[in-house]
Structure formats: structure tokens, C-alpha cells
Regions:
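Hydrophobic ligand-binding cavity/cleft-lining segments
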Residues: 2-63
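Hydrophobic pocket/interface hotspot
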Residues: 28-32, 38, 88, 124-126, ...
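Alpha-helical packing segments of well-folded alpha/beta enzyme cores
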Residues: 153, 157-161
Length: 173
């Protein structure tokens, strides 16, 4: 399920995407908070580089509220198209993080992900709020193009997560 909020005159937009997975929240959390898990979600369209100081660390080992480094988005895994100046705003309670960062083309980027157990599986809930930088907004159709790209990307991420979880469930049975 995908929701979009924001008005034509507003520079900020918000998306929410939810998916139900057939594996536990703990198992999903272990996957989605690793560089490998993040890049698996983005594959094949994007790959994110990992700043050196973050390599080999679990999300709960990272400081909140501090700049953590620059991650590059590589289209098809090779072509740099944007960067993310990563700041982890919050971790927890339980299986939750909130990233508040900026990018080359996006002034503010707030990505909150919550994973919770439901029934015999789990639910992944992403909430993304962003504000594009003004120069891009002067290009006719740019805002709509960016919204379309981000909607596609988050749907794709959840499709990849659903596929990963189904494969994990098969392995566990």
C-alpha cells in the first residue's frame, strides 16, 4: 500500500509503503539494517556505497544525531547519480529507525522504517518525507518526475523484500 501526501504548492511530499512478510520482525530487521540488505532492496536499479566508518557496524552501534558520512547512489551499480549525507536521527524503540539526511537533489530526506510482528509474520512500514531542492523545482515536470521515481523505487524495494522473505520462509521449512 502506498500513500502520497502533499499539495501542488507544497515543496514537501510524504509517502508511506507497507508490506506483510511471512517471516519474523527480528529476521527482517537483521536483513534490512545491513548494507547487503539495503542493496538487495535497491537491486538492480541502484547500489549505495557505505562510508568507511560505518562498515561492519550494526545499526545499534551507530551514533544518533551525528553526520555519519556520504553514501553514493550508483545507477545500475556503477554510475553515480546522487549522494546521501547520512544522519541517523533515531533507532528504536524495538525495530525502528529514522534517517534524517540531505542529498544532492533533495534538501531534506526523512526515512522512517518500522518492522513489527503480526500473526505468523511481520509488517514493514516505510514513511518517507522529502523536500526537493529549489533549482530542480524550476525545471517543468521535475517534481512529478521525482515523485514518480521515488514511488517506483519504494514499491520495488518492498517487492524485493517480499521475495526475499518468501525465499527465507522456504529455507526455514
Amino acid at each position: 500500500m502506498l500513500y502520497l501526501r502533499g499539495t501542488e504548492g507544497s515543496m514537501k511530499s510524504t509517502f508511506e509503503q507497507k508490506s506483510t512478510l511471512p517471516v519474523s520482525a527480528a529476521e527482517v530487521w537483521r536483513h534490512v539494517t545491513t548494507p547487503e540488505g539495503i542493496n538487495d532492496e535497491l537491486f538492480p536499479w541502484l547500489r549505495m556505497t557505505i562510508p568507511a566508518r560505518l562498515r561492519g557496524k550494526a545499526i545499534d552501534q551507530l551514533p544518533c544525531g551525528q553526520y555519519l558520512g556520504r553514501s553514493w547512489f550508483l545507477a545500475l551499480g556503477v554510475l553515480p547519480v546522487d549522494f546521501d549525507d547520512i544522519t541517523l536521527a533515531e533507532v528504536g524503540p524495538e525495530y525502528r529507525f529514522k534517517e534524517a539526511s540531505s542529498m544532492l537533489g533533495i534538501r531534506t530526506w526523512v526515512h522512517e522504517r518500522t518492522v513489527r510482528d503480526i500473526g505468523e509474520g511481520s509488517e514493514v512500514h516505510d514513511r518517507l518525507s522529502f523536500e526537493l531542492r529549489r533549482p530542480g523545482l524550476w525545471i517543468p515536470g521535475w517534481r512529478h518526475a521525482m515523485i514518480g521515481i521515488l514511488k517506483f523505487l519504494f514499491r520495488h524495494r518492498h517487492t524485493r523484500l517480499i521475495r526475499w522473505a518468501a525465499d527465507r520462509k522456504k529455507l526455514n521449512n
